[in-house]
């Protein structure tokens, strides 16, 4: 795992990706920090940090897109999968390398509350709780991107799929209002989600028939539930949407509340998607 970690970190900084990711994240944090905290003399660093969370949707997929997709494109995944290194070590090595790159601008941002304290009173608990939450959100986004990268050999597809998944998580509260209203738009969005799931199943199974069958069965069930028991479907699905609200627990950290439930949620997301990444690699190893 150590060798893979070193190789991945080196590869990020021998190419432009590592520098671009670090520079982009730190630049946006610095921009909001300067505009909100330094110019207007506001001690609320947590809110400035929260304003930059949207940047993750664009930057972090660029970090995770090459983790496994590049290996498949260059056919070096065969060497990796047949090496004596276990699948968990491969996944963790690549994931921790991405975390190291992402963590660099976060560590640099830790100095910002100290600078603010030179000009007045600053709540360090709120500032560093927000930074910790920011790191956990980013680590979760990277885990999602790593799994998607393991499913494809095209970096562009990996980037777009990761961006789409994170965008859905970011806008999940807006999407949820469509379902609570029970209108036609809710049905359309549900069909789109079903189509995406069916495509993923078809890709994993490498069988268009299976993916099509899943979509047809799901569509029939969807129509029946909306016609006969719409309340059941909407209640169950709203609960599922709550679980997909990846950025919601971050709000508690921004408010200065170091919640154990938020930490457990993010660690669970990371563990789940790293496990799914390992399963995708295991499947390719046996195939």
Mark where each language-model region is:
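Hydrophobic alpha-helical transmembrane segments
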Residues: 1-70, 95, 111, 127-132, 159-160, 188, 203-206, ...
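Helix-capping/transition residues at the boundaries of transmembrane alpha-helices
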Residues: 11, 69, 80-82, 141, ...
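Secretory targeting signals
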Residues: 29-36, 40-46, 50-55, 97-162, ...
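Transmembrane helix segments
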Residues: 35, 155-251
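Alpha-helical transmembrane segments of polytopic membrane proteins
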Residues: 50-54, 130-137, 183-195, 213, ...
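Helix-loop-helix units of permease transmembrane domains in multi-pass membrane transporters
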Residues: 67-97
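Alpha-helix N-cap/helix-start motif at helix boundaries, enriched for small hydrophobics
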Residues: 88-92, 148, 281
């Amino acid at each position: 795992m150590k060798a893979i970690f070193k190789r991945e970190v080196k590869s990020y900084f021998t190419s432009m990706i590592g520098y671009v990711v670090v520079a982009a994240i730190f630049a946006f944090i610095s921009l909001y920090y300067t505009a909100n905290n330094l110019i207007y003399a506001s001690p609320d660093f947590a809110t400035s940090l929260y304003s930059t969370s949207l940047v993750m949707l664009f930057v972090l997929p660029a970090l995770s897109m090459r983790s496994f997709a590049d290996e498949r494109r260059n056919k070096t995944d065969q060497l990796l999968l047949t090496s004596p290194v276990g699948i968990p070590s491969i996944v963790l090595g690549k994931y921790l390398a991405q975390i190291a790159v992402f963590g660099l601008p976060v560590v640099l941002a830790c100095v910002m509350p100290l600078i603010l304290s030179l000009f007045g009173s600053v709540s360090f608990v709120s500032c560093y709780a927000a930074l910790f939450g920011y790191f956990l959100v980013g680590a979760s986004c990277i885990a999602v991107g790593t799994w998607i990268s393991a499913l494809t050999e095209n970096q562009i597809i990996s980037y777009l799929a990761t961006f789409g998944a994170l965008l859905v998580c970011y806008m999940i509260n807006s999407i949820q209002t469509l379902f609570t209203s029970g209108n036609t738009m809710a049905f359309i969005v549900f069909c789109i989600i079903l189509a995406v799931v069916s495509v993923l199943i078809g890709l994993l199974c490498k069988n268009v028939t299976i993916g099509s069958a899943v979509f047809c069965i799901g569509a029939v069930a969807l129509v029946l539930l909306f016609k006969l028991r719409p309340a059941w479907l909407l209640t169950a699905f709203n609960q599922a949407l709550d679980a997909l609200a990846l950025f919601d627990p971050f709000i508690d950290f921004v408010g200065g509340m170091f919640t154990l439930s938020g930490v457990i949620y993010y660690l669970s997301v990371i563990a789940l998607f790293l496990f799914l990444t390992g399963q995708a690699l295991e499947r390719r190893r046996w195939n």
